[in-house]
Amino acid sequence: MEFVFLGTGAGVPSKGRNVSAIALQLLEERGGTWLFDCGEATQHQILHTSVRPRRIEKIFITHLHGDHIFGLPGLLGSRSFQGGTTPLTVYGPKGIEQFIEVALSVSTTHVKYPLEIVEITEEGIVFEDKQFYVETKRLSHGIECFGYRIVEKDIQGPLLVEKLREANVKPGPIFKRLKDGEIVELEDGRVLDGKDFIGPPQKGRIITILGDTRYCDASRILAQDADVLVHEATFAAADQTQAHDYFHSTTEQAARIALEANVKRLILTHISSRYQGDMYKELLREAKAVFAHTEIAMDLKSFPVER
């Protein structure tokens, strides 16, 4: 599991930062990639990374401001030309379906793969399978905006092969049955319960990715005990009034959420273009003064998510 930040700027692109897009690479876990937001030129940024559009299986849109969605029609269209044939699902607030359908229709763009659009109308779980579930809550922004909590379900512990050997159980198909938790009768009449030969489960990881937001309770709830929190930090601490007026957060406010939610690691993104060059170092210093385990995202930078 790995983050690839495709765009870390706010509002408009700058020379150093493109607008919002984050790829969550799940290649080892499920052979695919999830994209969070898709600002203008996202597909161009992808060209400089290991992300493959044909492997993108889900796109989660936080809200419908242009710096988070204007790259979506182009990416959806190009995916067809880049070998994308597998289904793709787009999740987002009410209006995302109309935006996509109008953009593709007016430009006579035809996708050659199954495309599903899910409009989020209620808070709660928007996706779940055997590996993950994704939960969402409304944040505090000028328009409807969601944050996403991605929870990896606990992974079954390993088969205790040495314990089986000590019990004089020979390798073979029986190992798989025991690993599947079956109760198995051996040729000598012994009955083994697979659960007795499986190690403790490996705890799944929790990732929280927030859209644009003021400091709010929903952010803290979504981030509770997360391994990684990705939080916007549009403004420096001194610009708190502007942050509030424009429905955004400061570096210190993002760090406070991380501290209050007991997260392990905070990554700041959505940095205003007013902070150029090495000014990001001061933003990072402000956040670290509140929450030590803070990093700041840069375009095309990768962050592995450790267990």
Curated annotation (Swiss-Prot):
Annotated catalysed reactions = Endonucleolytic cleavage of RNA, removing extra 3' nucleotides from tRNA precursor, generating 3' termini of tRNAs. A 3'-hydroxy group is left at the tRNA terminus and a 5'-phosphoryl group is left at the trailer molecule
Give a single Pfam family match.
Answer: Lactamase_B
Provide the disulphide bond pattern.
none
Q: How is the cofactor bound?
A: Binds 2 Zn(2+) ions.
Keywords assigned by UniProt, alphabetized:
Endonuclease, Hydrolase, Metal-binding, Nuclease, tRNA processing, Zinc
UniProt binding sites for Zn(2+) 1: H63, H65, H141, D212
- Organism's domain of life? Bacteria
Which cofactors does it use? Zn(2+)
Q: What is its EC number?
A: 3.1.26.11
Using the UniProt record, name the top-level EC class of this enzyme in a single word: hydrolase
**InterPro entries found in the cross-reference section:** Metallo-B-lactamas (IPR001279), RibonucZ/Hydroxyglut_hydro (IPR036866), RNase_Z/BN (IPR013471)
Q: Describe the protein's quaternary organization and the partners it interacts with.
A: Homodimer.
Annotated HAMAP family = RNase_Z_BN
- Please give the NCBIfam families that the UniProt record associates with this protein: PRK00055.1-1 (NF000800), PRK00055.1-3 (NF000801), RNase_Z (TIGR02651)
Family according to the record = Belongs to the RNase Z family.
The molecule here is called Ribonuclease Z
Q: Which organism is it from?
A: Bacillus cytotoxicus (strain DSM 22905 / CIP 110041 / 391-98 / NVH 391-98)
Gene name per UniProt:
rnz
